Amino acid sequence: MCSFPRLRASMLALSLSSALTIAADAAEVTYALTIANGRVPDNMRLIRVKQNDVVKLEWSTDKPITVHLHGYDIEREIKPGTITEMTFTARATGRFTVEPHLGRTPSGAHTHGDTLVTIEVYP
């Protein structure tokens, strides 16, 4: 005879155990990124993190710019003389680019410049 309350309790315990394991493996990582003349230094153009890490990008720039993290759909306006934070939990795995928004097309879509940073999220 199957006991659904016992099965439900076992599934809940397993789910909570999995969530705690994921939380224990997750890290908080911070990267200070400076945009100068429309570029990030070569040694900061590739960032590697693990799935479920909390990633904080601290942006500074020499000219006003809007940046967009593709795949997570996060956009920030960055102004000279300030640090602008872009924080997210790396839930999706894969390669995600951060690109500047340069303007709008006649149809209203925004245009992107060259990739500033690539973020690789590993399982």
Region annotations inferred by a language model:
Residues 2-11:
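Bacterial N-terminal signal peptides that target proteins for export
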Residues 66-69, 97-99:
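Beta-strand acidic-aromatic groove motif in beta-rich domains, primarily in extracellular
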Residues 10-21:
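Bacterial N-terminal signal peptides
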Residues 27, 31-33, 78-123:
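Extracellular/periplasmic metallocenter environments
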Residues 45-63, 83-92, 96:
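Beta-strand cores of secreted/periplasmic/IMS beta-sandwich domains, seen most often
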Residues 37-46, 69-72, 81-85:
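N-terminal post-signal-peptidase region of extra-cytosolic proteins
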Residues 21-27:
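Bacterial Sec-dependent signal peptides at the C-terminal "C-region" and cleavage site
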Residues 27-54:
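N-terminal edge beta-strand
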